[in-house]
Amino acid sequence: MKEPDAIKLFVGQIPRHLEEKDLKPIFEQFGRIFELTVIKDKYTGLHKGCAFLTYCARDSALKAQSALHEQKTLPGMNRPIQVKPADSESRGDRKLFVGMLGKQQTDEDVRKMFEPFGTIDECTVLRGPDGTSKGCAFVKFQTHAEAQAAINTLHSSRTLPGASSSLVVKFADTEKERGLRRMQQVATQLGMFSPIALQFGAYSAYTQALMQQQAALVAAHSAYLSPMATMAAVQMQHMAAISANGLIATPITPSSGTSTPPAIAATPVSAIPAALGVNGYSPVPTQPTGQPAPDALYPNGVHPYPAQSPAAPVDPLQQAYAGMQHYTAAYPAAYSLVAPAFPQPPALVAQQPPPPPQQQQQQQQQQQQQQQQREGPDGCNIFIYHLPQEFTDSEILQMFVPFGHVISAKVFVDRATNQSKCFGFVSFDNPASAQAAIQAMNGFQIGMKRLKVQLKRPKDANRPY
């Protein structure tokens, strides 16, 4: 039976061929094991070289940590084993955030409110520079069970005098959660993250790809809209109009049996709102047929593609998928889930015969060269140091996409342990995006560290001539 205050341990630096039955003899000498689980990739099922361990008794966990952490190196590993409380324990589900307090309540008032649930290590009401209460506090118990009991009893249980809503009691955020939230706030201030893209994931990949084009334009601080940028903006307006009517809110799955969700079928084209102007340009007026007015003026001479008339209905999701094809080569992992969700359009022309072997070989060589070209031009590649240990390629891609079109984003990983080295690189397709990323993210704090973002030196920078 597990004790209420038992500690969940994270075990790292273990060989990938060792399963639970192989690891148990190492840890059973310190006490009875309640649960031991090797962590595996949820998609591939591959061993990740780490595990979670929970003893029945708290003392057993402390003994194991004291005897093994950084003390013993398992066969086949270059670094000693890591045994420490898991993230949820170290933060550790003992510290509570208390919101919607009255402005007049003191530390002692809050302590009296929470004392019935256990021993309190810390109790602090947050105050501004002038000493005025911010209406919230942090309370830290000795055990997770005590903190959980306080949440179960007090959360939303009452409205305190001077508060505008019921009492809020929840576990405090981790450093990682606060860091990610600040990154999202920075991106929101830059006006480059789409809430639609963040909410609907793979179904909005087309929108995210178009946003990269717009982000690069913003990073360059250019007031002139090029024809290609104007086209991207018009396309983004079209997608925003579709999303505003809830057309992307219903996921399409292969089992649904239809390529058009009910929201699309029930929404007439005339109900789609007019798109907003781009950088001061007014939206192009349209006739009832869906075609642009004959006297309309277009920025840079680029005609926006109008919504389809009722006489020729086209699935807007299928349009999005068709327009997304040329982005899939750059980010295959990001779009791998999209293809099954969108049915393939019917062939409009007869199937072409396969190219001759010589042409196939040339195409394969070109594809290999494109895959090998991971870096952008000189002045477009940046290094990022002091990354959190848990950050992967997808996290730094999400972090730097707002600044422009990303060619590649990579976190360096130790080949022996498959653990992050806490630094990586990002390549853009233009210097302006790289400089904008450096200015915004260099010195950005995540947890206890600040990111160091700098430009990679050109290949010939060290040459004396």
Curated annotation (Swiss-Prot):
Function statement: RNA-binding protein involved in the regulation of pre-mRNA alternative splicing. Mediates exon inclusion and/or exclusion in pre-mRNA that are subject to tissue-specific and developmentally regulated alternative splicing. Specifically activates exon 5 inclusion of cardiac isoforms of TNNT2 during heart remodeling at the juvenile to adult transition. Activates the splicing of MAPT/Tau exon 10. Binds to muscle-specific splicing enhancer (MSE) intronic sites flanking the alternative exon 5 of TNNT2 pre-mRNA.
Protein name in the entry: CUGBP Elav-like family member 3
A single GO BP: regulation of alternative mRNA splicing, via spliceosome
Major localization class: nucleus
Location of the region described as Disordered in the Swiss-Prot/TrEMBL record: 283-311, 345-379
Gene Ontology cellular component list: cytoplasm; nuclear body; nucleus
Top-level taxon of the source organism: Eukaryota
Gene3D superfamilies hit by this protein: 3.30.70.330
Lineage per the UniProt record: Eukaryota, Metazoa, Chordata, Craniata, Vertebrata
Domain RRM: 7-88, 95-174, 380-458
Keyword Cytoplasm applies: yes
Subcellular location: Nucleus; Cytoplasm
Keywords: Activator, Cytoplasm, mRNA processing, mRNA splicing, Nucleus, Repeat, RNA-binding
